[in-house]
Amino acid sequence: MNPTISPVGDSAISIEFGQVIDPKINQRIRQTVASIESLHLEGIVEMVPTYCALLIQYDALRYTYAELCRILEPICTQPMSADESELLTVVEIPTVYGGEFGPDLGFVASHNHLTEADVVSIHSGTDYLVYMMGFIPGFTYLGGMDPRIATPRLSSPRTHIPAGSVGIAGEQTGTYPSDSPGGWQIIGRTPVSMYDESREQAALLKAGDYVRYVPIDESAFHCIKKLGSSFKPVVHHVKAGDLRGGK
């Protein structure tokens, strides 16, 4: 479908590229962001990519809605480039599965008629696309989880989920960047800080990155935890065809 542009209040617009969660749609959104950034337009306050749309906040004293639409329409309708040599960023997230770190691993396994080892193997066998950021600072909305481990949310959310907890809700998976309430099924925990305001880029991940969960043991967890912000996760740069899980 052709992108549709619509106003959001008096100083923002939404560009909708589709109505389904799809990596190609999300790639088009990211390419649109890059194209707009290359213009260095004064008055663009912020661009927020979502699953299927791009929200652009702008200075209403600089542009009218109609003026901005005239600038953006040619960019939004240009064909998406299909560079097969493009390298994608894959960030390894070391994770302890099960036990006190993943109290719901057993339920996820039994719900799907699998062993706990099966769940760990399936969950860590896919590279997950970061579609967008939201909910709380540093939280990533990931796509690509294998439906074989899909599990409903908890019927009663917990009042406290520790930072770094890795969870499953429906066909989604993700990592809690900070302590918070939550209703996801917790299957593990990472010692890596997903959000740290002392870093130049506070959030470890950004839209367009891929996450690769790597199983570790409890000893490795505590070693990495002690390193704190000095620990640097392993980062791979791979072609699309080399992603795990084929997503």
Predicted regions and their residues:
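Glycine-rich active-site loops that engage anionic ligands at enzyme catalytic sites
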Residues: 1-247
